[in-house]
Amino acid sequence: DFIKGVSFPTNILYAGMLVSAGILYKDDALIKKSAILSERINEFSFDGKYYCDNAETEGGKLKPCRNHVSETCQYYALFFEIAKNRDFKERMANDFSLPQKDNPDGVVKSSVFIGNFLRIFWLLKEKRYEKILSETKDYFYDMSVQTGTLWEKAEPTASCNHGFASCM
């Protein structure tokens, strides 16, 4: 169960909110709190290859669930700049892509919202424009041809006219 206990994607989102609020309100205490939380996330969630999604308390200690690794959690870490490891960033940019069916190392695949959008927005921050263009065409083109819309999922099994996809 990927959301049991401490959720690292939720804590990453919280760290992102703290730093944004700190910048907006010129509050160094919020920025520092975000930096400390980011360090803890890297300490507990990142194993040198991937960020695990959650941790549970066992005997009063936080124990990361190393077998709970989703593609979406990786994109949270990248988009919110928790991930600093250059090799990790390159691996996520090059070994993963929107249209692929299976991920390396059994990493659980993202859905369109929010994981795939985080990937696209992270690639945009990284100025990888050709990669964004290629992946969005590969992923969304067939949808647009079939229904003239963008879908909630990769297959037409749910909403085939999804509002979140309008940001594309």
Task: Name the predicted role of every residue range.
Residues 1-168:
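Active-site core of glycosidic bond-cleaving carbohydrate-active enzymes
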